[in-house]
């Protein structure tokens, strides 16, 4: 039975490593009663895509993160969504490693800044799963 379970798990596509890193950073900075998944499909920018003006401070964190990834994508051979990087969670902060200006460091700094911003911003339940066609134009 263990083999069957492992074989079944092998068919689940893995998340890109940096997404796992970003999720870990978010979990480290947000209130205990929240999960990182509650930050997807929040406002106009948290989750895939984005348009219009951010609706609050938390949504602005995602807007800034999207733009940061856009800037990182201009670095030669840099794909922010799949770039792995090294970091450390310590004493309520996040430390990114690597040479300044490299793809890995820039992407880590994007994720670090967003995660810390999430931790500092109010989560408004009514801004989860909003009608983006209506509120994000």
From Swiss-Prot:
Its EC number is 3.1.1.4. InterPro entries: PLipase_A2 (IPR001211), PLipase_A2_Asp_AS (IPR033112), PLipase_A2_dom (IPR016090), PLipase_A2_dom_sf (IPR036444), PLipase_A2_His_AS (IPR033113). Ca(2+) binds at residues 45, 47, 49, 66. It comes from the Eukaryota. Its cofactor is Ca(2+). Expressed by the venom gland. Belongs to the phospholipase A2 family. Group I subfamily. D49 sub-subfamily. It is found in: Secreted. SUPFAM superfamilies: Phospholipase A2, PLA2. PANTHER family: PHOSPHOLIPASE A2, PHOSPHOLIPASE A2 FAMILY MEMBER. The keyword Transmembrane helix does not apply. One of its GO terms (molecular function) is calcium ion binding. Binds 1 Ca(2+) ion. It comes from Bungarus candidus (Malayan krait). Heterodimer; disulfide-linked. The A chain has phospholipase A2 activity and the B chain shows homology with the basic protease inhibitors. The keyword Thylakoid does not apply. This is Acidic phospholipase A2 beta-bungarotoxin A3 chain. One of its GO terms (cellular component) is extracellular region. Keywords: Calcium, Disulfide bond, Hydrolase, Lipid degradation, Lipid metabolism, Metal-binding, Neurotoxin, Presynaptic neurotoxin, Secreted, Signal, Toxin.
